Amino acid sequence: MIINQIYSIDSCDDVELNIKRGSKLEFRLTYDDSKEIEAIVCIISGLGGDIDDNLYIEEYCARNYNVAVLSVNYHCIGNRPQTGASFYINELDRLILKTSLEAIGIQLPVDMQNLKTYDEFYCVVDFVNKFIEKLKKEKELSEDYCLYLSVGLEPTKNEYQNYGIMQAIDIINAILYININLPFKVSNMSTVSRMGGGIKTILIGVSHGGYLANLCAKISPWNIDVVLDNSSNVTLDNDLWRFIGFGREIDYVKYCSVGITYMFKNIKLAAFDKTYWTTNKQSPYYFSNARKIVREPLNKEHLKIQSLYPKPKYIAYHSKFDQYVLLEKRENYFNILRELGFEVDFIKITDEKEIDGKFIKNLEHGCGIPMKLLIKKHLLQILKEPLQDKICKKEVSYKCDELVYT
């Protein structure tokens, strides 16, 4: 029988920002209780997704393979409207609204600094949207004019965007919890125990989910056997740091976390994750270069340290035409891994001829590869491969400028 079990446990506090966590870590485990389980498959959701999106794939895997499937609602996963986030405004949003209206000569009998809630903000913006439409009809503004404003995204569970570290630790903690509290029968349990680690663990993710899979392998390499990754970022370069949420401090139009274009005809909202990270160098929450590089799987010195531990296998896909992540970054990452003795299978999609309409559907970010087919193509072979020896010191440290992360 297929079992779907939801867990809620304590996980990590935010050690970087010295913030006590108030929320529980939630995850779901799906397995067939009639089978002896050979591996844990962890499907990691990307931005805009959560475990509710994974149930069909989880049950497919549990029915067709001898695996238990883990899906984790990691820290700040509810940071998009479709996963429960709500809009809010802060002082900077009010200032942007005020100065933007002044720039096009719109004066309202409202003190913008008195706007306390998003609902109040929405009413003003709705009025401005209609006023802009009137100005367009009167030829005072061009038809293609669009006003850009900013708003914040308040995640569920009163969380905030730490980005990467707490999310990866949550995934690792969920894996460790299941290994300690196995609810299913394990195939070759004596071999698993002898090899110094838990049951074979496979991380699968697309985009941000793939990024977190690689980050888990960096933080806790002895707990990960295979990373199966489609189109992830391996640095925060190419403006990818904007997903942290402090981009409104620099250029709110260029560096938003996500654009909201469906609410108003004449206004686009640049939305930003709620975060304590800031560009203010005087703040204890300053996002320094050290904070950046610890979050980047692509760091040669860090990879050298990781190579001293049990080595996960990497299987990855990436398009030459990916609009977010440069293929060259990924090539560099996997070339370094190979040099350091990691097993890597890196599939580069570089030509329209590779589009088959079923597995590879386009040349854009993610290549349209269905998660089910990605799993179907690789999982059986992964399960046939021997469990690696994980006997090692279960602690790793990475020097990041003036900081050391352990």
Where are these regions (language model features)?
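N-terminal cap/lid segment of alpha/beta-hydrolase-fold proteins
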Residues: 1-39, 95-101, 159-162
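Primarily recognizes the serine-hydrolase "nucleophile elbow" in alpha/beta-hydrolase
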Residues: 177-248
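Short amphipathic alpha-helix adjacent to the substrate-entry channel of hydrolases
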Residues: 53-72, 143-144
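Alpha/beta-hydrolase active-site loop signature
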Residues: 48, 73-78, 234
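A fold-wide structural signal in alpha/beta-hydrolase
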Residues: 40, 66-75, 202
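Alpha/beta-hydrolase active-site loop
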Residues: 90-191
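Short beta-strand element of the alpha/beta-hydrolase
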Residues: 37-47
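Serine-hydrolase catalytic core
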Residues: 252-406
